[in-house]
Amino acid sequence: QLSGSSDIYTLRKSDGQTYSDDSTDIWDVTAAKETGSGFDVLLEGSDGTIREGYNFIWSTNSSGVITSGSGWLTDAQTESDANGYENRFGKDFNNDGLISGGSAYQLLGSSDIYTLKDGSGATYSDDSSSLWDATAAKQTGSNFEVLFEGTDGTSKEGYNYIWSTNSSGVMTSGSGWLTDAQTESH
C-alpha cells in the first residue's frame, strides 16, 4: 500500500498484479515517497540473497501503477549525489552517517535526520567550498561528530577537520585542520 496525501493506493503493475512482502524472498519494499506525478518506491535486496547490497527504484503514476524502474543499483550507485536517492528516501545507503544528495548536509541520528548548521543557522553542502567536503558523520550520545576532508589538489589535501555538534546538528566546536596522521590519533 502506498499512502498518498489524499488516498491509499495499491502498488501494482499495469496488468493488475500486486506486490507485498510475500511476493519474493530476494527483496522487500522498504520506502515510498510521493512525487508530483505518483510515487518513487524503494526495493532493497534481502540479506543473504543475490540481491543483498542492491536496490531498485520503481516509479508509479498517481494511482500506484508501476510505470518505470531504475534497474538494480549497488548501494554506492543508489547513494551517489547524481541519483539523489539517499535524500529522496532519507536512507543512508553507504553507512557514512550522512544523507547525501540534498541542498545541505544531513546527519542521520538514531531517531531523526538533522541538517548540519552553524550557530547562525547557515547550512553547508558539497557546493559550499571547493577546499573540503563532509565525508562522514557519527552520532556520539545525542550529539554528532562530522568529518570534513580536504579536497585533492587543493591547499587542504591531506587535512581533515572534525566538527562537533549539539543534538540538533548545530556546530558547537571544531578540531582545527589536522593532518591525516593527527586525525587518526584524534
Predicted regions: what they are:
Residues 1-186:
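Long, low-complexity, Gly/Thr
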